[in-house]
Curated annotation (Swiss-Prot):
This is Methylthioribose-1-phosphate isomerase. Its EC number is 5.3.1.23. InterPro entries: IF-2B-related (IPR000649), IF-M1Pi (IPR005251), IF_2B-like_C (IPR042529), Initiation_fac_2B_a/b/d (IPR011559), M1Pi_N (IPR027363), NagB/RpiA_transferase-like (IPR037171). Catalyzes the interconversion of methylthioribose-1-phosphate (MTR-1-P) into methylthioribulose-1-phosphate (MTRu-1-P). The lineage of its organism: Eukaryota, Viridiplantae, Chlorophyta, Mamiellophyceae, Mamiellales. Its main location: cytoplasm. Pfam families: IF-2B (PF01008).
Length: 365
């Protein structure tokens, strides 16, 4: 069975799967311009660090295609690209992928504008946006394969021995252009016959685990069990978790990483129980310019996400709410960082050489 599609794109047309409607309804939102994409990202109709970056790039491609006749100079076209992506970046700035996409496409537009050929420039920018979509699918496949091997090694799994893996939030086909990052690792284990069971945390308060990851596991017939966030330690204590793999929205130069709220607690429990803990993300999520996790901006969400469920209040009127969307897990709690170019492991000094790894990956070595 083919994977779910969070993003449907053909030249001039973009549809985003409305993930707020899942798992009760499967419907797509027609995105005609960057303003509509900004709203979809802000409201979390589309979410997942890779997916929002790809959605933003393709929304720009759609709007550029529609405005071919009105952008008559390279200067106007470059200014348009710069303004549109700057605006979309404000939707969810914690995820480094969105900023990486913004910088990449804006730099491409600036370079192409020097030709003086506005038609060729617009075509080149659109093709650049489309290339990001294809690249993400390929990188997720590589993350899955490399991650599956890394988890089996970390668990000391013998030939033919299957493992039980825990994850949180949603990092599969719904969070990327296809296949997934952390859930892609689980998917690769299943496809190779090495997965016994996947455990997904519900991931309060937005329930991406229960609404989305459980939906993907059932859709693809991968053996999975849904648990509440506060059950993870008890499951580890029973010896029912061989490894943990989660996603990341930003990985700092020292290996600290921001991910969905609750990841830090999961990592602390994993360390106590001796369970190897990995994060899986494309190289675009690695941010060597951010020194440590203390420098990562953490988005805070509306309190209603905690006080209400399915539109109905479930908490006392007047109670204060703190609702950060992410937390930062210290690198000391991490076993490795899985990317499409390989796994970053601690060096002899006990540090993750993120900056060196990124430089080598971007240099093609």
């Amino acid at each position: 069975m083919s994977s779910l599609e969070a993003i449907r794109y053909a030249r001039g047309n973009l549809e985003l799967l409305d993930q707020l409607a899942l798992p009760l309804e499967t419907k797509y939102i027609d995105v005609r311009d960057c303003n509509a994409c900004w709203r979809c990202i802000k409201d979390m109709n589309v979410r997942g660090a890779p997916a929002i970056a790809i959605a933003a790039a393709l929304a720009l491609a759609v709007e550029l295609e529609a405005k071919r006749g009105t952008l008559t100079t390279c200067e106007a076209a470059e200014a348009f690209v710069r303004e549109r992506f700057d605006h979309m970046y404000t939707s969810r700035p914690t995820a480094v992928n969105l900023g990486e996409a913004k910088n990449r496409i804006q730099a491409l537009a600036k370079r192409l504008s020097e030709s003086g050929d506005v038609s060729g420039m617009i075509e080149g920018v659109i093709e650049g946006c489309e290339a990001m979509h294809a690249e993400d699918v390929a990188s997720c496949r590589a993350i899955g394969d490399k991650g599956a091997a890394a988890l089996l090694r970390a668990c000391g799994a013998k030939d033919g021995e299957n493992i039980k893996v825990m994850t949180c939030c949603n990092t599969g086909s719904l969070a990327t252009a296809g296949y997934g990052t952390a859930l892609g690792v689980i998917r690769a284990l299943w496809e190779s016959g090495r997965l016994e069971r996947a455990y997904c945390l519900e991931t309060r308060p937005y329930n991406q685990g229960s609404r989305l990851t459980a939906y993907e596991l059932v859709y693809e017939k991968i053996p999975g069990t849904l648990i509440c966030d506060n059950m993870a330690a008890a499951l580890m204590a029973r010896g029912d978790v061989d490894a943990i793999v989660v996603g990341a929205d930003r990985v700092a130069a020292n290996g600290d990483f921001a991910n969905k709220i609750g990841t830090y607690s999961l990592a602390v429990n994993a360390k106590h129980h001796g369970v190897p803990m990995f994060t899986a993300a494309p190289v675009t999520t690695l941010d060597p310019e951010t020194a440590t996790g203390a420098d990562i901006h953490i988005e805070e969400r509306p309190g209603e996400e905690v006080t209400h469920s399915l539109g109905k209040r479930v908490a006392a009127e007047g109670i204060d709410v703190w609702n950060p969307s992410f937390d930062v897990t210290p690198a000391a709690l991490l076993t490795g960082v899985i990317t499409e170019h390989g796994v970053i492991e601690k060096n002899a000094s006990g540090l993750f050489p993120v900056a060196d790894f990124v430089a080598q990956a971007k240099g093609g070595t």
